[in-house]
């Protein structure tokens, strides 16, 4: 793993008057580039050659500079990394960046300074490690089954990493699990039982609150020292299975798919905001204990509300999530913090800009 000191050494050679924001042209990049533009920062997009014309077609959300690659794996080449460093680029991780480049490669081989704490990708990328994080935080979570033989009620089986629900399946018995697991194996999505996590299926309403934590701003919640926590939006994900009611009886199996295809805006009853913020505080506090300096910047708690059990957290995405694309002009919650449109992409850019002004860029980079 590249030590933080080495990344900060690279950062120390940057011309901070010309810092640029960079990311892969995918996932939430349009929002990130637009946010940089609104904050007066230039941006760099790493784009597949065949995709460049389409990203150029968005005049207010295309990057100022394109770096064309044949595959996203090229991002790890010395040539590409040196080009990014020479442009004073701070990379913004998102789901596609993590999935296409790989959290292990980012930790071991990617020398370009990144916004936030890249150790979060290590803890996020493996569901067993992430479960340790959630348990340390003390937030309610679904039961995890150590063996398929223990399945005694409906479960959902998930793959590791940022796969957007691809390959997930539901089972109610060991026999059903092995049948569907074998199908995944034939498709090459899994190799062994170590590649999946078996999780209790919780009935309820899904909520995905988007948070931003700044370690350079003043405290705004008494239970959370050393920074400011903001709730900038909430979404729920539109999965293929959500459209099952539209299928003909002989097509029902085609809809039994948890692949995320889009996002829908949501607000919660105001009394529940305290629950969301309280659990977010626990997640941040735990992250500091487990992987100092802990969470920095955007993150999302993936939750289900069950009437008898309250909010249950089944996952944390320790980066900007695609659901924030709903709020490129701000959300109902962002206006409680800012008297101007504030997307998550813009909030990232502002944090970087303010860190440069205050001489604290090193506090938000790894």
From Swiss-Prot:
Domain named ATP-grasp: residues: 131-357
Catalytic activity reported: 5-amino-1-(5-phospho-beta-D-ribosyl)imidazole-4-carboxamide + formate + ATP = 5-formamido-1-(5-phospho-D-ribosyl)imidazole-4-carboxamide + ADP + phosphate
Entries under InterPro entries matching the protein: ATP-grasp, ATP_grasp_subdomain_1, IMP_biosynth_PurP, IMP_biosynth_PurP_C, IMP_biosynth_PurP_N, PreATP-grasp_dom_sf
PROSITE patterns in UniProt: ATP_GRASP
Entry EC number(s): 6.3.4.23
Pathway involvement of the protein, from the record: Purine metabolism; IMP biosynthesis via de novo pathway; 5-formamido-1-(5-phospho-D-ribosyl)imidazole-4-carboxamide from 5-amino-1-(5-phospho-D-ribosyl)imidazole-4-carboxamide (formate route): step 1/1
Binding site for Mg(2+): 302, 315
Disulphide bridges: none
MF terms (GO), sorted A to Z: ATP binding; ligase activity, forming carbon-nitrogen bonds; magnesium ion binding
Top-level taxonomic group: Archaea
Membrane-traversing stretches: none
Needed co-factor(s): Mg(2+); Mn(2+)
Cofactor comment text: Binds 1 Mg(2+) or Mn(2+) ion per subunit.
Binding site for ATP: 154-208, 239
One Pfam entry name: DUF1246
Enzyme category, top tier: ligase
Family per similarity comment: Belongs to the phosphohexose mutase family.
Protein role: Catalyzes the ATP- and formate-dependent formylation of 5-aminoimidazole-4-carboxamide-1-beta-d-ribofuranosyl 5'-monophosphate (AICAR) to 5-formaminoimidazole-4-carboxamide-1-beta-d-ribofuranosyl 5'-monophosphate (FAICAR) in the absence of folates.
PANTHER family, per database record: 5-FORMAMINOIMIDAZOLE-4-CARBOXAMIDE-1-(BETA)-D-RIBOFURANOSYL 5'-MONOPHOSPHATE SYNTHETASE (PTHR38147:SF2), 5-FORMAMINOIMIDAZOLE-4-CARBOXAMIDE-1-(BETA)-D-RIBOFURANOSYL 5'-MONOPHOSPHATE SYNTHETASE-RELATED (PTHR38147)
Name of this protein: 5-formaminoimidazole-4-carboxamide-1-(beta)-D-ribofuranosyl 5'-monophosphate synthetase
The encoding gene: purP
């Amino acid at each position: 793993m590249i030590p933080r000191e080495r990344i900060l050494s690279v950062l120390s050679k940057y011309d901070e008057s010309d810092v640029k924001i960079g990311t892969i042209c995918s996932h939430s990049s349009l929002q990130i580039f637009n946010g940089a533009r609104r904050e007066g920062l230039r941006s760099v997009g790493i784009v597949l050659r065949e995709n460049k014309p389409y990203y150029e077609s968005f005049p207010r959300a295309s990057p100022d500079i394109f770096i064309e690659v044949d595959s996203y794996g090229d991002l790890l080449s010395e040539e590409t990394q040196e080009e990014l460093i020479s442009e004073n680029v701070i990379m913004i991780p998102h789901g596609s960046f993590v999935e296409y480049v790989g959290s292990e490669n980012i930790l071991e081989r990617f020398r370009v300074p990144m916004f936030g704490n890249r150790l979060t990708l290590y803890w996020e990328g493996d569901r067993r490690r992430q479960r340790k994080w959630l348990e340390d935080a003390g937030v309610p979570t679904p039961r995890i089954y150590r063996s398929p033989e223990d399945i005694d009620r409906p479960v959902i089986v998930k793959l590791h990493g940022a796969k957007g629900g691809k390959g997930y399946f539901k089972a109610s018995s060991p026999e059903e699990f092995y049948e569907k697991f074998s199908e995944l194996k034939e498709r090459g999505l899994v190799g062994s039982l170590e590649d999946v996590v078996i999780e209790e299926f919780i009935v309820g309403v899904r909520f995905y609150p988007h948070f931003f934590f700044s370690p350079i701003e003043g405290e705004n919640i008494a239970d959370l020292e050393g920074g400011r926590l903001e709730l900038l939006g909430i979404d729920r994900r539109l999965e293929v299975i959500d459209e099952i009611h539209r299928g003909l009886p002989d097509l029902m199996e085609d809809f039994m798919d948890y692949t995320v295809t889009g996002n829908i805006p949501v607000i919660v009853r105001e009394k529940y905001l305290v629950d969301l913020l309280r659990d977010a505080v626990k997640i941040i506090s735990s992250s500091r204990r487990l992987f100092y300096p802990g969470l920095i910047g955007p993150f999302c708690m993936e939750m289900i509300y069950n009437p008898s059990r309250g909010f249950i957290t089944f996952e944390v995405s320790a980066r900007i999530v695609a659901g924030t694309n709903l709020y490129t002009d701000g959300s109902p919650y962002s206006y409680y913090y800012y008297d101007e449109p504030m997307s998550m992409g813009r909030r990232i850019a502002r944090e970087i800009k303010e860190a440069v002004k205050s001489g604290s860029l090193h506090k938000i980079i790894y």
